Amino acid sequence: MLFVEFRFFLFFLVVFAVHWALRGNTARKVWLLACGHFFYACFFIGDPVAFLGQIRDGDWAKMPDGWWFPAVLWASTIMDYVVGRGLGASREERTRKLWLLASLAANLGVLCYFKYFNFFVTSAGAFLDWFGLHTSLSTLKIILPYGVSFYTFQSMSYSIDVYRRRLAPVRSFLDLAFFISFFPQLVAGPIVRAMTFLPQVVEKRTWASVRVRDCCTLFFIGFVKKACVSEFAAQIADAFFAEPSKYDHLSSVLGVLFYAVQIYCDFSGYSDMAIASARLLGYELTPNFDFPYFSRSITEFWRRWHISLSTWLRDYLYIPLGGSHGSKLFTYRNLLLTMLLGGLWHGASWTFVIWGGMHGVALIFHREWQRSTGNAGALFKKTMAVLAVPLTFYWICLTWIFFRAAPLIDEKTGAIKATSLEMAQRIFKAFTLFGAHGSKSFGLDCLAVFAVLALVHWLNSRRIFTAAWQRLPDWAAAALLGVGTELAILFVPVKYKAFIYFQF
């Protein structure tokens, strides 16, 4: 059930109405917990009537793939609730460490099995083959549960914060279960911290705190980003990444640029709609984006892009590794290791590891650059101030090539004609000054569309639209949102692509 689908609006209308009609806070939490698991189930049960019939008849062979996904979610929740209670009752540091280790082992074990088992097996097999030790390692048919990368991180952060004594363990299992399975952020974030969300769960939400106009505006912006802009950009990006060698150099550049547009509008659009939905129910989620493509350095980019993940990696991985407390080499090791693991978190592929490594190297380079140019002249600093944003964006686009690259499959035989790494290499050459030699072209109209999107995005980053919007009376804002929604619907495709981050 995607946020841009009509059935989600019907679902949310029922959730919203019942939530605010209920008087007691406990009743509301039970209701939203049930809604969260219903929302989660909609991703795999298919036809609800047929699914219930299969359960009634015990016809397990015909059950849809992933019907057991909720069991993984419940197991993670129960595990960390027990760990939290154990940490709260323990006084000896050794015992507390054992409790924390149990949480980390369980959550990371689940993540490694479902997401990385086959990756590790195939990588080990390729490594042994490289040394001439031919093996026949077998992979398993493993289905990745939706949202497992997100809710395991949330669940782990709760146990870690309780261990660090930054958070008291929750007494009510309902509170923790609600926190982990709150449907706006369940499948693709933002990754919410227990320290910021659990206090909201304890306190009853009030309608007076809900700014309906702001929520509807934010949801509309997210809807347009995903349903209109991202879906349009995907047509160009998908066409190029499927056959990069057939396009000329300008079209190769446009193909990568439109993927940058696609992934930003897709993911930030989802985050906008998730945050808006939560706010309409009285809850606040972590902001996830702050115009990252206008960053003046890769360091600033990671303060603006996927903020909930970057801060999670900082607080629960980079700092525990030692952070910047130590030698320069020690600090750079921590940076690179954090980004490599951050890349691997996104997917079980070496292209994601390379993507993370490129960001890690760029972060190290930026620190060295700051040290070496600290005493540079005024003219040099002004020149770099002008070039900082385009150079940073160019590097980000280079990294997106490895993030997006997928293996080339023969449609007739199903054989792999080129691996993800080989495709990334071809696209990298086409995008950079090496040039491309194909004849297909997207045309100058696509370049004009990109320029218009960039201009609108820049104006929005300057809060120009926000200031004008806030001056409008409520009736005018409501009318414009209604007209805007009708116009947006005219441009939406018949069938939406799933949000990109659902696969992670």
Regions found by a protein language model. Give the residues of each.
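Membrane-embedded transmembrane alpha-helical bundles that form the catalytic cores
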Residues: M1-Q503
